[in-house]
């Protein structure tokens, strides 16, 4: 049956919704594909659901093709499994928590690693049962602090998550490779260009991790790539570490007055004015900027840490968050922000704008072994023998020629600085180019983290209990749909790839006489009989101009106009993407459209 606009549950809008800040959000709402229910939560309307089912179908076909089996878990889950894996606390405020009438704790699932693990534990006990790959397409929930961009960053979203279970790492490698190849095929079929980038594992844990990033100016993520093939999420980029410097002839560190110099710019200016260096002027790269940060701990409360970075670099809090859990020995990603004024006042030994590690190793004021007890981490560029200007922990004073390791030490190095265009790739493949992108999919080699936490073991071929190794693989289904809408649109509306469009053809009946609608009904019936799905604009009291504007907004790739020329047995066939049109004979409509569909079944129809 055709989708008739005269009865379809649809309302198109002429104006953009006031809360929409990206084109995909504006157009999906205006075209009547989705409707906002609450911040970050959307209702799917009939046309939107039709596109969503097509996206899900592609994902399902590719998962089935690699031998994964579909299951379906509840979204409402008990607390206990997430306590066992420590993610009840690691997820922090991003987790939707609730209680039943008896006071038992539950959550709305952000992911399902624990539940998949327990299911396999409940059913399998021998190496003969493995390997196995399971997947689901299910609604997920995350309490985003600032939901934005419509479906791209919501609180409720649909995700395909799959999991592999193997006896050994070789099996995990095989499952990982199968999923990676399946993801490449999925994004090709969706018509979305992606870059596979190295990534951090965050709260998921595990070892190897890659993201599939769709380059986009509206993307929230930053990634880097080089001409030589290196690609990584900016949080996963490792700094090329300089060689240690011979400091045998370095002068002793000295404290100098530096009035009104609490910033790097003022410090450099004062240094060149009051304490000039022979041979070359001081620059920001000669300074060591020490910043106090507040880390939110999983069990509640905060931890102050100090991070020292070259003064010509800025701190990237996302990179800090990716590594600070490991540096503190806590694990997982932790939220980090600049220390508050109140937190700074609680450490009177440190003077804002003039914070430093101390005048010597014996007088250290930063580090877990120092009087403040504040863990001190430095950028990897701070290597033994490097000389710095840094704070003296006295107002309007700085230390000059403070030598790393000779005069101060640190607890650990931490990737904390913003990655810059032109920085060297860690693998030596050339300078880095920075790009914005949307994370479309993520594949993890989880290893044995969840299996150990939840006791998933099987008997191996020697009768010995071994811990199962796991992989986790996710694709944001609703985000992928939004990304397609963001990538394929113009100033008039959506431009669906043919294999995702809610219908194959949009038939528009124009003209006032009953013969026009009768002819359109007959043509639609013939198209449907030939297996062509039709969106039929049969609205009787709507002007041709409104119908044409709606056809452009809705984005079905082929538009058939029945009206002008009907008396001569001629119809108009429009290509929504190119804007071109041509006349075709009425008795050739079905043959020409079916031939066109057979030759243009996917994103190649663009």
UniProtKB/Swiss-Prot annotation:
Keywords: Aminoacyl-tRNA synthetase, ATP-binding, Cytoplasm, Ligase, Nucleotide-binding, Protein biosynthesis. Its EC number is 6.1.1.15. GO terms for molecular function: aminoacyl-tRNA deacylase activity; ATP binding; proline-tRNA ligase activity. The keyword Transmembrane helix does not apply. It is found in: Cytoplasm. It is an enzyme of class 6 (ligase). One of its GO terms (biological process) is prolyl-tRNA aminoacylation. InterPro entries: aa-tRNA-synt_IIb, aa-tRNA-synth_II, aa-tRNA-synth_II/BPL/LPL, Anticodon-bd, Anticodon-bd_dom_sf, Pro-tRNA-ligase_IIa, Pro-tRNA-synth_IIa_bac-type, Pro-tRNA-Synthase_IIa_type1. Belongs to the class-II aminoacyl-tRNA synthetase family. ProS type 1 subfamily. NCBIfam families: PRK09194.1, proS_fam_II. Catalyzes the attachment of proline to tRNA(Pro) in a two-step reaction: proline is first activated by ATP to form Pro-AMP and then transferred to the acceptor end of tRNA(Pro). As ProRS can inadvertently accommodate and process non-cognate amino acids such as alanine and cysteine, to avoid such errors it has two additional distinct editing activities against alanine. One activity is designated as 'pretransfer' editing and involves the tRNA(Pro)-independent hydrolysis of activated Ala-AMP. Consists of three domains: the N-terminal catalytic domain, the editing domain and the C-terminal anticodon-binding domain. Homodimer. This is Proline--tRNA ligase. It comes from Kocuria rhizophila (strain ATCC 9341 / DSM 348 / NBRC 103217 / DC2201). The lineage of its organism: Bacteria, Bacillati, Actinomycetota, Actinomycetes, Micrococcales. The gene is proS.
């Amino acid at each position: 049956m055709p989708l008739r606009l005269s009865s379809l549950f649809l309302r198109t809008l002429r104006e953009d919704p006031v809360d929409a800040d990206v084109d995909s959000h504006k157009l999906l709402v205006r075209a009547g594909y989705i409707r906002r229910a609450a911040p970050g939560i959307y209702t799917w309307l009939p046309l939107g659901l039709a596109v969503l089912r097509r996206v899900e179908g592609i994902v399902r076909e590719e998962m089935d093709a690699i031998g994964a089996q579909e299951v379906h878990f509840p979204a409402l889950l008990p607390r206990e499994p997430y306590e066992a894996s420590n993610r009840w606390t690691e997820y922090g405020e991003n987790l939707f928590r609730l209680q039943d009438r008896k006071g038992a704790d539950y959550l709305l699932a952000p992911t399902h690693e624990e539940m998949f693990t327990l299911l396999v534990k409940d059913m399998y006990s021998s190496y003969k049962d493995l390997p196995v790959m399971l997947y689901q397409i299910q609604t997920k929930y995350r309490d985003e602090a600032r939901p934005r961009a419509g479906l791209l960053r919501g609180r409720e979203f649909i995700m395909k998550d799959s999991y592999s279970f193997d006896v050994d790492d070789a099996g995990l490698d095989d499952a990982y490779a199968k999923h990676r190849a399946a993801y490449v095929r999925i994004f090709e079929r969706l018509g979305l260009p992606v870059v596979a980038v190295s990534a951090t594992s965050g709260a998921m844990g595990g070892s190897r991790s890659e993201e599939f990033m769709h380059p986009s100016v509206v993307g929230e993520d930053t990634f880097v790539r080089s001409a030589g093939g290196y690609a990584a999420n900016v949080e996963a980029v490792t700094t090329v570490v300089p060689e240690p410097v011979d400091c045998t002839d370095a002068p002793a560190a000295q404290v100098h007055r530096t009035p009104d110099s609490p910033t790097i710019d003022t410090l450099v200016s004062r240094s060149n004015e009051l304490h000039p260096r022979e041979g070359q002027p001081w620059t920001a790269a000669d300074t060591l900027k020490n910043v106090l940060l507040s880390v939110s701990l999983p069990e509640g409360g905060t931890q102050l840490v100090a991070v020292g970075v070259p003064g010509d670099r800025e701190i990237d809090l996302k990179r800090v968050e990716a590594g600070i859990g490991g540096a503190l020995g806590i694990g997982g990603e932790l939220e980090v922000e600049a220390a508050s004024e109140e937190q700074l006042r609680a450490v009177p030994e440190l003077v804002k704008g003039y914070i430093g590690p101390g005048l010597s190793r014996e007088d250290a004021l930063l580090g877990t072994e120092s009087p403040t007890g504040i863990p001190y981490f430095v950028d990897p560029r701070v290597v033994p023998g490097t000389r710095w200007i840094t704070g003296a922990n006295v107002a309007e004073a700085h230390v000059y020629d403070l030598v790393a390791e000779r005069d101060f030490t640190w607890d650990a190095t931490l990737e904390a600085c913003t990655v810059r265009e032109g920085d060297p790739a860690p693998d030596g493949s050339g300078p880095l180019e920075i790009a914005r992108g949307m994370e479309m999919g993520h594949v993890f080699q989880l290893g044995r983290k969840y299996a150990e936490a939840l006791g998933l073991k099987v008997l191996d071929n020697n009768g010995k209990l071994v811990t199962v190794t796991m992989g986790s693989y996710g694709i944001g289904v609703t985000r992928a749909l939004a990304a397609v809408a963001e990538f394929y649109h113009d100033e008039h509306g959506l431009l669906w790839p043919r294999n995702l469009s809610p219908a194959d053809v949009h038939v528009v009946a124009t003209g006032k006489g009953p013969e026009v609608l009768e002819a359109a009904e007959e043509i639609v019936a013939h198209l449907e009989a030939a297996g062509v799905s039709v969106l039929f604009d049969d609205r009787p009291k709507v002007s041709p101009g409104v119908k044409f504007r709606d056809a452009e907004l809705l984005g079905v790739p082929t538009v058939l106009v029945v009206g002008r020329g009907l008396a001569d047995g001629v119809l108009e066939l429009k290509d929504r993407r190119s804007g071109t049109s041509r006349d075709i004979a009425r008795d050739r409509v079905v043959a020409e459209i079916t031939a066109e569909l057979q030759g243009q079944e996917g994103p190649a129809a663009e």
